[in-house]
């Protein structure tokens, strides 16, 4: 931001550096109270949520431009819940999560998925799209593809964002951290990921990084992020209502349930869905189309 590197999510270090002060936690709380727009009692969108709880200056510097790039929308068009996921701390903890335990698979997600699909009872077919006729081949289907695509977009296409990646190879260290966000609207990419920092116990002479460019997901693109807009919920509800009436199929994952999910939640819900299915078999009950609230 403005040629400087700041700590995110916003914490005491960020506040002191950005405003050029040396606040204690209590002083920082008082400072932000002065910056916040207290006239916004019930924030109705992302922008109002930001103005109410962090103030205009921090919002403009760290969130406005980044949000426009990431979602292709002005923050006033996004629900307040999008910002509620991001913590603001009045200490020097710059961790995004408050979980008791954090981690990644020891050998990475690629190896984890590889181990799953190599199971003797799992067959993988590439370059083959799912069709409704295939449902008769199975007792039950778990569908993790896009919800609207399952119905051939009969009511219209739901909104998604997709990503383009530009690879950077550096012979040493590139940025000194795993992920760095670029908040300015003038920088076309949203962030750069330097993957070796996710596994600091490894030693690498070179480094591979990727710039991420977010854009609207069009036909033929890979959908990454569901865009849940308040003015588009009628279309989503049409698909959800129809899906809930289905038999012998369960919609799962980020695309199947049309929700923004972190990886830990995705895995936890997959395990939960498996438990629900096994219980339904044991008790001879009907398996629901959704095992989570959508």
Describe each region flagged by the PLM.
Residues 128-238, 242:
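Mid-domain catalytic core of redox enzymes
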Residues 8-10:
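Short capping micro-motif at the N-terminus of alpha-helices
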Residues 13, 193-294:
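Conserved flavin/dinucleotide-binding core of flavoenzymes
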């Amino acid at each position: 931001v403005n040629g400087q590197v700041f700590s995110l999510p916003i914490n005491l270090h960020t506040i002191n550096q950005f405003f050029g002060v040396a606040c204690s936690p209590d002083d920082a709380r008082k400072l932000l109270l002065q910056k916040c727009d207290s006239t916004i009692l019930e924030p109705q969108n992302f922008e109002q949520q930001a103005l109410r709880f962090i103030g205009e200056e921090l919002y403009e510097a760290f969130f406005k431009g980044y949000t426009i790039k990431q979602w292709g929308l002005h923050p006033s068009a996004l629900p307040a819940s999008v910002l509620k996921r991001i913590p603001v701390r009045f200490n020097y903890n710059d961790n995004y999560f408050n979980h008791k335990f954090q981690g990644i698979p020891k050998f990475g997600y690629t190896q984890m998925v590889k181990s799953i699909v190599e199971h003797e009872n799992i067959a993988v077919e590439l370059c083959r799209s799912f069709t409704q006729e295939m449902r008769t081949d199975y007792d039950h289907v778990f569908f993790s593809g896009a919800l609207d695509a399952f119905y051939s977009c009969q009511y219209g296409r739901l909104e998604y964002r997709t990503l383009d990646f530009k690879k950077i190879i550096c012979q040493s260290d590139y940025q000194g951290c795993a992920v760095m966000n670029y908040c300015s609207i003038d920088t076309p990419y949203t962030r750069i990921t330097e993957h070796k920092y996710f596994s600091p116990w490894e030693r690498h002479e070179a480094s591979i990084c990727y710039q991420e460019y977010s854009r609207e997901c069009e036909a033929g693109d890979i959908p990454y992020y569901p865009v849940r807009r308040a003015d588009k919920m009628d279309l989503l509800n049409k698909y959800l209502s129809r899906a809930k009436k289905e038999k012998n199929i369960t919609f799962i994952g980020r695309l199947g349930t049309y929700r923004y999910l972190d990886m830990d939640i995705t895995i936890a819900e997959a395990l939960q869905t498996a438990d629900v299915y096994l219980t339904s078999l044991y008790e001879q009950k009907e398996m629901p189309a959704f095992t989570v609230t959508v």
